[in-house]
């Protein structure tokens, strides 16, 4: 029994020795310094060259509703999110001051009309007196002075009538202005849309004498406009009408497709330098050294039938510069720069195990792959990270 155990132990030790010897022989048979080669194949793929930018969503159409009349807000009939229709009553301002002014204007007109009626009566009397004086003068029964006085009285009365008529016309014009001011105390929706902001409250006093107080904003949430900020280096590639698409943080993988409507000719600046209007976000950002990155604003519109797009959402925009479908392509990492413009260098791994360097003409490129126009064939294996080969 003990002898059998010693025999098995000798056999086990002998097998381990033979295994170690075989490994040593295999290791010494490999070429010294040989390294594994990583390769990728030239395949067909869809290539899309694009310019990326960040943007902000804004309603294409909106209006800020302000107050043209001063006074206290008596009733505010809408809240943020309410749907409104053109002509709908939104706000009522206390009309006491405007109503009193209108009443005073009407009373003034009544007074002027009464004085006008009096002068017309005086005109009739002056006409009768002048006729009497002329009749008497015809038979020499009155003085010339009395005749002249009657004529002057008639002219004065007619002038007063003209004056009161002019004053009534002036008062009527003021009355129309007062009526308009009274109408301003009732504010109506200028268009259909959604109330997206309310900046006033019931009981708040408005002063419209110096500037127009803003009360609320109404916007149409379809279509929406993306205000995209494109860097100075890329703005030359952007043209009106070119295809673009964008994503939002809330939309996940959903894409919205559109076309460029407009490229604004100057970059927006802070309000203390110039006023851009239109809800344009600032696009010049200062770095730690105080230098500014110049960015230009590009506008594109998109329909929003389901309301998934909301104001102030951040978007990532892709402006499609070029597209190619199922073309020969290779990873950018597999190509090196060349001295010749438009040509790249590729290390092709042959079937014989040798590496051949080729000059490759390329086309469109995205962030990962580049289109192969000439120099490579489908199925070629390209070496990644290998030293430059001879030939080519």
UniProtKB/Swiss-Prot annotation:
Residues 1-36 form the signal peptide. Keywords: Coiled coil, Periplasm, Signal, Transport. GO terms for biological process: xenobiotic detoxification by transmembrane export across the plasma membrane. It is found in: Periplasm. The keyword Secreted does not apply. Part of the tripartite efflux system PvdRT-OpmQ, which is composed of an inner membrane component with both ATPase and permease domains, PvdT, a periplasmic membrane fusion protein, PvdR, and an outer membrane component, OpmQ. This is Pyoverdine export membrane fusion protein PvdR. It comes from Pseudomonas putida (strain ATCC 47054 / DSM 6125 / CFBP 8728 / NCIMB 11950 / KT2440). The lineage of its organism: Bacteria, Pseudomonadati, Pseudomonadota, Gammaproteobacteria, Pseudomonadales.
